[in-house]
Regions:
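Flexible, glycine-rich beta-alpha linker
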Residues: 1-11, 34
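C-terminal substrate-binding subdomain of Rossmann-fold SDR/epimerase-dehydratase oxidoreductases
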Residues: 13-155
């Protein structure tokens, strides 16, 4: 997922905050890992729908049909932040890094009437970039420790 208040160790905030600090973002492996990106507000609304309208004992998967590769997301971030789309460094992949997270949220939509409100990923990403720009005091102290840990792992 993506949204405000996400720790700087996570993919999207790590890329955004690296660019804000004048550093080149890092991309694991080939960058072809795919995630179903869902805004945190939509995720929270889905959890609430399950808690208040879901049937006890049922399993509901939460997804927003937002599948996109990491390299596509990073290039979008770079573009939105006025950087060349190749202004990043490749790093070795994490051990056990999942290639794709596939989510079928059709049951959640059909049975509980939930659907995502944040369907324009670029617009949502722009808002997240703005949030991190306005809340540097929230993330800056965690950034160096996070990057030091990644450097120690060669990432």
């Amino acid at each position: 997922n993506y949204g405000p208040y996400q720790h700087v160790e996570k993919f999207i905030p790590r890329q955004i905050t690296s660019i804000m600090e004048g550093a080149r973002p890092k991309l694991y492996g080939t960058g072809e890992n795919v995630r179903d990106w869902i805004h945190t507000e939509d995720h929270s609304r889905a959890v609430w729908a399950i808690l208040t309208r879901g049937r006890i004992g049922e399993t509901y998967l939460i997804g927003a049909d937002g599948e996109m590769s990491n390299i596509t997301v990073l290039r979008m971030i770079l573009q939105l932040m006025g950087q060349p789309e190749d202004a990043f460094d490749w790093v070795r992949d994490r051990p056990g890094h999942d290639r794709r997270y596939a989510i079928d949220a059709s049951k959640l939509r059909a049975e509980l009437g939930w659907s995502p409100m944040h369907t324009d990923f670029a617009s949502g990403l722009r808002n997240v970039i703005d949030w991190y720009a306005e809340h540097r005091d929230w993330w800056a102290s965690a950034k160096e420790a996070t990057e030091a840990r990644y450097r120690a792992q060669g990432q």
